[in-house]
Amino acid sequence: MTEITDRYFNDVIARLSGLRDRLAAQMEKAADLIAAAARADRRVYVFGTGHSHMMAEELHYRAGGLAITVPILCGSIMLQDGAVASSHFERIEGAVRPILDRYGIRDGDVLVVVSNSGVNAAPIEAARYAREKGAAIIALTSVAYSNTIARGRTQLLSLADVVLDNDAPSGDAVLEIAGSALKVGPVSTALGVTILNAVFADVAARLVGEGDAPIYLSANMPGSGDINRSLVERYRDHNPHL
C-alpha cells in the first residue's frame, strides 16, 4: 500500500469509528421510522441527485437488503445522461416535483433524502414534498459542509425528522497532495453507504424478530429465485424499478 492509499484508508476508518458512536442515537431513530413504515405496509423512498443517487441504487433490490425500499431514479438528476446538465438541473426550483409525482409517496411512508451539501433546490424540494404528503424525512448530509456554504439558504437538515451527519468535510475530498492546491479522495459515498446499510440492517433484525422481514437473497445463492420472485410480486405495484 502506498503512502496516499494508506492515508485514505486511515481517514475513512477513523471517520467510521467516530460515526459508530456519535450517530448511534440518530441511526436508531432512523431505524424506528423505517420499521414503523414496514409494519404499516408503507414504503421507504430514497432520493439523491448527482453522486448521491448511488445511495438509492445501493438500497434497491440489494442482496441482504429490504424490499420495502424504492429508489427515485431519473436520468436528469443522475450522471449518465450528462453530468454537467444534472448539476444544473438540481439547482432549478420546481424541477423535481414532476419526478416525485410518479412514485405515489403518501402518509406513513419514509423519504430518505441524500445530499452532501444539503442546500441545492432538488433535495430541499424533495423534503418539502414529502412533508406535504405526510411522509417522514430522513436526511443524510454533511452538517459541516452544509453550514459552511448555506449563507442564509434553507438547509436540508432543518427540514428532516432525523439527520444522519456523514462527517464528510467541506468539499468532500480529504487528502492533500504535495504540489497541488486541490484535494483528492472523496469520502461521502463510503461513509453514507455504511450508515444506511447499518440502519437497514437494524430494521431487518427488528422485522425478523417480529416474523416478517422482506429480505432479498443474492441471485447466485440457492433458493434465491423463489424468495426474490415472491418479494417482487409483493412490492411491484409500489416500485416501478422492479
UniProtKB/Swiss-Prot annotation:
It comes from the Bacteria. InterPro entries: RpiR-like_SIS, SIS_dom, SIS_dom_sf, SIS_GmhA/DiaA_subfam, UPF0309. One of its GO terms (biological process) is carbohydrate derivative metabolic process. Gene3D superfamilies: Glucose-6-phosphate isomerase like protein, domain 1. Residues 30-214 form the SIS domain. Pfam families: SIS_2. GO terms for molecular function: carbohydrate derivative binding. Belongs to the UPF0309 family. PANTHER family: PHOSPHOHEPTOSE ISOMERASE (PTHR30390:SF7), SEDOHEPTULOSE 7-PHOSPHATE ISOMERASE / DNAA INITIATOR-ASSOCIATING FACTOR FOR REPLICATION INITIATION (PTHR30390). HAMAP family: UPF0309. This is UPF0309 protein BAB2_0325.
